[in-house]
């Protein structure tokens, strides 16, 4: 059996037939971490390391596991040395999704059919750099070649959205690039919370003295994002909590934290509950899909974090007590306040997949005709793997409606990551194909093909319509 051919990851005849339905579908990449400035300025890359390894903490994490020195990962080593170090790692990375993604990127973007190894690394390095220069590889071309119709970036609440505005005004670029409202610093445990409050007051020209004036200022920023094409918000929580309090305690807590007080866990939970519920009310008002990423235990290697900052490959999946109690209480409270927006919940720890899918099924009722108003998001980060995707789809199929699933997203900082959509589609087709092959569903390729196409693209298009 050959590797990374047209039949890659397609494990049965039904999968091959279903894949014919989805392989040419466009991409609706509703959540990523690309910089809109890079898209607008359309920088031409002249070195493969800048394009392929720079900022990619998946690869960095793998290289550290293979004993590569930090100098050859994020340090002063030459680009060729870094590329060789990655090749040394990749040739031993069987079973890791980076092995598959890398092979697909090399073949489908650059036409490199060989398996990258230490022995051929230097030759392939120079060949890739020549390809970049000869073909003038830039972000817009990579986006167009992948047939990406929509990109949802991840943006700070105080962002001017200058580059989104410029992209929207550029008639030569057809892909929609929309901002996503990501207010991590609005939560009191964040190390930049106090600075954020000061800057929020400056940009909104509001005196923020308590909880209500804080929320009023946040609404002004949400309205600004809405005026500039925003369709979604995002947030990352270590745990899902539900601990209510009154506005008097919130005001007292706000003022104490602004004066340097370090809040305890109960106070953090009370603030998170109150702020998130108010934000959800506003997200529903302004028509934002609300994305919730949860379960990441971040920056665990303190030395590397202090040296390199966040998102450098030292994060873990977490666990928590009473997830379903808190999640049900939170969602029910939002329903009672008529503040439940469309939501996508991304769970990092696969042990909770059935619990999350089961909980979301409690709150699907809506009079808008929205299919799966609350979405169970695709396998995220450490679950963005073959088994992680299958676990998520199993839970959703058993507890909800897989046919309504809005499918894949890159959640990436790399312009080469669109291959992950194809990777997902191949796994999806094998998953559905096994149902057909094992007689678990009718051998109706029209119905199953339509379902696969919806999951690959159309469901997301429909879900993100304002």
From Swiss-Prot:
Its EC number is 5.3.1.12. It comes from the Bacteria. It is an enzyme of class 5 (isomerase). Pathway: Carbohydrate metabolism; pentose and glucuronate interconversion. GO terms for biological process: D-galacturonate catabolic process; D-glucuronate catabolic process. One of its GO terms (molecular function) is glucuronate isomerase activity. Pfam families: UxaC (PF02614). Transmembrane segments: none annotated. The keyword Kinase does not apply. Belongs to the metallo-dependent hydrolases superfamily. Uronate isomerase family. This is Uronate isomerase. It comes from Streptococcus agalactiae serotype Ia (strain ATCC 27591 / A909 / CDC SS700). The lineage of its organism: Bacteria, Bacillati, Bacillota, Bacilli, Lactobacillales. The gene is uxaC.
């Amino acid at each position: 059996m050959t590797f990374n051919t047209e039949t890659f990851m397609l494990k049965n005849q039904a999968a091959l037939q279903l894949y014919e339905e989805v392989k040419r579908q466009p991409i609706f990449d509703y959540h990523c971490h690309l910089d809109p400035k890079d898209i607008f300025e359309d920088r031409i890359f002249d070195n493969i390391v800048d394009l392929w390894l720079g900022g990619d903490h998946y690869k960095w994490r793998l290289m550290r596991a293979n004993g590569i020195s930090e100098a050859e990962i994020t340090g002063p080593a030459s680009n060729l040395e870094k590329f060789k170090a990655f090749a040394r790692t990749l040739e031993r990375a069987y079973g890791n999704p980076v092995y598959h993604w890398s092979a697909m990127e090399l073949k489908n973007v650059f036409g490199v059919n060989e398996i990258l190894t230490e022995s051929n690394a230097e030759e392939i390095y120079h060949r890739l750099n020549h390809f970049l220069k000869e073909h003038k590889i830039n972000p817009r071309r990579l986006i167009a070649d992948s047939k990406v119709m929509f990109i949802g970036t991840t943006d700070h609440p105080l962002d001017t959205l200058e580059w989104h505005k410029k992209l929207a005004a550029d008639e030569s670029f057809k892909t929609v690039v929309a901002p996503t409202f990501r207010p991590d610093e609005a939560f009191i445990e964040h190390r930049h919370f106090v600075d954020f409050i000061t800057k929020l007051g400056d940009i909104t020209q509001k005196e923020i003295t308590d909880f209500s004036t804080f929320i009023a200022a946040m609404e002004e920023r949400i309205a600004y994002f809405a005026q500039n094409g925003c369709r979604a918000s995002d947030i990352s929580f270590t745990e899902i909590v539900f601990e209510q309090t009154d506005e008097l305690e919130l005001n007292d807590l706000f003022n104490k934290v602004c004066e340097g007080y370090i809040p305890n866990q109960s106070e953090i939970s009370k603030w998170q509950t109150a702020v998130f519920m108010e934000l959800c009310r506003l997200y529903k008002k302004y028509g934002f899909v609300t994305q919730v990423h949860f379960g990441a235990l971040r920056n665990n290697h303190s030395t590397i974090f202090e040296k390199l900052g966040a998102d450098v490959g030292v994060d873990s999946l977490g666990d928590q007590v009473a997830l379903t109690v808190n999640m049900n209480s939170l969602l029910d409270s939002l329903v009672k306040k008529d503040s439940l927006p469309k939501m996508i919940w991304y769970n990092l720890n696969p042990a909770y997949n059935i619990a999350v899918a089961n909980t979301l099924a409690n709150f699907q009722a809506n009079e808008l005709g929205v299919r799966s108003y609350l979405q169970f998001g695709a396998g995220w980060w450490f679950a963005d793997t073959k088994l992680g995707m299958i676990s998520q789809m199993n839970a959703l199929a058993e507890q909800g409606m897989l046919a309504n699933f809005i499918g894949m997203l890159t959640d990436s900082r790399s312009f080469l990551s669109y291959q992950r959509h194809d990777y997902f589609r191949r796994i999806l087709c094998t998953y559905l194909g096994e149902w057909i092959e094992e007689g678990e569903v009718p051998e109706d390729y029209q119905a199953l093909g339509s379902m696969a196409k919806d999951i690959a693209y159309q469901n997301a298009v429909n879900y993100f319509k304002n």
